[in-house]
């Protein structure tokens, strides 16, 4: 069964020479990653992940590098400041094999608190990290750190074979956090954004299936469709 630690206590378990893997965006364990910034003894700490949702001081420290599969604002800022942020080319389908090849000693994620069946739910992120999370929990020479947060919703896949839970008995370290989940702000569109969205809307036929992305223009398109008469 796991030990329950504070973020700082969990951060103390990381070696000066180590590898840490995490998933995209909503998988980021914010309290743990923040606590790592309190140390300055890193010799060769390498992160493997994607799309940070916060700016973490640990990534500004000497001896720390980050292999990133998807750049967001935090990665671009860190890179512009001269820190060791390296892009790992690959599509979403390559996230799982890239992470497996990286083979971090430590895997981390945020999740819901354990349920009555003794499982945590990966909540807002499933992605391609679960197999590596499970491997980290099963091998005694690796470490699985899960940061639980009661503010996270429980989710499940439409397809039953894609489970997004992790049994508590596989977890080495539990961190109890209570921060609010990250939420994207909806910036006000300018005239150009509205014009582009209006052009895109003309290509959406009644009954179409639409995959949207993150950003002002996809938000305008989705909002206009929601308010419109298309089925």
Predicted regions and their residues:
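Conserved alpha/beta enzyme-core scaffold
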Residues: 1-231
